[in-house]
Design a protein with these regions (language model features):
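Binding-site signature for planar aromatic cofactors or substrates
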Residues: 1-166
Length: 166
C-alpha cells in the first residue's frame, strides 16, 4: 500500500499494465505540504466538492460554497472551512462524526482552469477560534492531509486529463 494506492488499485494497475505510470504520477502529484500555488488555488475557490462515508462505508458527495477565502490553509498540512446550515441534514458532517476520512476536490473552470485534490482526516467543532470570525457559520471543519502525501494536486488545463483522471 502506498499513499495513493491500495491492493485493489494495484491489482487493476497490474492487469492493465499501468503500475509504472501510476507510480510516476504518485511521485509527481503528491506533496508533503501545501505549496504557495496550492494555497492560492484553495483560498481563491468559491466552491469545492467533499466526499465522506458513514461508519458502514455508505458514501456521500456534497457541494460546499462561499466567497473566495472561505476555505483557508491554516498550516502546512491543514485547511479549514466553515459550515453553514444548508438543508439541516448534516450529511457530510454527520458522516465525519463517525468516519473522519474525507476527500475534497477543488475545481476552477474559469480564468485558470485546474483542479486540486486533498485527502485527509477531518475534525468538526464548535470550539474553534475561526468560528467567531466567520459570520453565520455553525461549525468549523479542519482537515489534516493524510500521511506524508499531504496534498494530492493537479493544476492543469482541463483538456489534459489523460493521465490524471483517477
Amino acid at each position: 500500500m502506498t499513499i495513493m494506492y491500495h491492493d485493489g488499485n494495484r491489482r487493476l494497475q497490474d492487469q492493465f499494465d499501468s503500475r509504472r505510470i501510476s507510480d510516476r504520477l504518485e511521485e509527481k502529484l503528491t506533496r508533503t505540504a501545501f505549496t504557495a500555488d496550492d494555497r492560492a488555488f484553495i483560498e481563491s475557490a468559491i466552491y469545492f466538492f467533499i466526499a465522506t462515508a458513514d461508519a458502514d462505508g455508505r458514501p456521500d458527495c456534497s457541494f460546499k460554497g462561499g466567497a473566495p477565502g472561505f476555505v483557508r490553509v491554516t498550516a502546512p498540512d491543514e485547511l479549514a472551512f466553515p459550515d453553514y446550515d444548508g438543508n439541516g441534514m448534516f450529511k457530510s458532517l454527520g458522516n465525519l462524526a463517525v468516519n473522519a476520512h474525507v476527500g475534497m476536490l477543488f475545481i476552477d473552470l474559469h480564468e485558470k482552469p485546474g483542479r486540486l485534490r486533498v485527502n485527509g482526516v477531518a475534525t468538526v467543532t464548535r470550539e474553534d477560534p475561526l468560528l467567531a470570525a466567520t459570520v453565520g457559520a455553525q461549525l468549523i471543519v479542519r482537515v489534516t492531509a493524510r500521511g506524508t502525501a499531504v496534498a494530492t494536486a493537479v493544476t492543469s488545463a482541463l483538456g489534459d486529463t489523460s493521465a490524471i483522471c483517477g
